[in-house]
């Protein structure tokens, strides 16, 4: 990491279909090897499947899923006198969003459906109903933080 200055944050433009910045960030995380059009078709295809299955606006389901996956607290390692403690700390809002997006996509990639579009739509539907691997990941992180609550006074 550079000590001189932090890299300036780049502006993320809203996606063309919904005009939402979070959808663009999600799309960029789905993207492999700079293939944005492929990522776009996967995400929009998943949204179309969600709309067909639930008869609800897909953006609402997506936002609900992301809310259910974003962690509020996590543990970070802190070395104190030869021992390493897992110290629970609150998660900043930007990191919450990034972790939520990352966990949703990782969980979707690990599913058994045939295409990525189907996997993503199924994981988003599960997450919006508080089920699925992404929600389980959030619960595991919260459990770790709760188990190490005794070390919260080592917070920095």
Curated annotation (Swiss-Prot):
Listed GO MF terms: rRNA binding; structural constituent of ribosome; tRNA binding
Biological processes per GO annotation: translation
The organism's place on the tree of life at top rank: Bacteria
Keywords: Ribonucleoprotein, Ribosomal protein, RNA-binding, rRNA-binding, tRNA-binding
Gene Ontology cellular-component annotations: small ribosomal subunit
Subunit structure: Part of the 30S ribosomal subunit. Contacts proteins S9 and S11.
Function: One of the primary rRNA binding proteins, it binds directly to 16S rRNA where it nucleates assembly of the head domain of the 30S subunit. Is located at the subunit interface close to the decoding center, probably blocks exit of the E-site tRNA.
Similarity remark: Belongs to the universal ribosomal protein uS7 family.
Family matches, as HAMAP family: Ribosomal_uS7_B
NCBIfam families per UniProt: rpsG_bact
Name the UniProt record assigns to this protein: Small ribosomal subunit protein uS7
């Amino acid at each position: 990491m550079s000590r001189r200055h932090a890299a300036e944050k780049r502006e993320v433009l809203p996606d063309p279909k919904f005009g939402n910045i979070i959808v663009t960030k999600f799309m960029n995380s789905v993207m492999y090897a700079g293939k944005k059009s492929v990522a776009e078709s996967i995400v929009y295809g998943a949204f179309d499947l969600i709309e067909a299955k639930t008869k609800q606006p897909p953006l609402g389901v997506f936002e609900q899923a992301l809310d259910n996956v974003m962690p509020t607290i996590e543990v970070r390692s802190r070395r104190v006198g030869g021992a390493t403690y897992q110290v629970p700390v609150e998660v900043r809002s930007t990191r919450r969003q990034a972790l939520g997006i990352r966990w949703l996509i990782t969980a979707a990639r690990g599913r058994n459906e045939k295409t990525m579009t189907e996997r993503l739509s199924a994981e988003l539907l599960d997450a919006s109903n508080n089920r699925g691997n992404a929600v389980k990941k959030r619960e595991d992180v919260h459990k770790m933080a709760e188990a190490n609550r005794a070390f919260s006074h080592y917070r920095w």
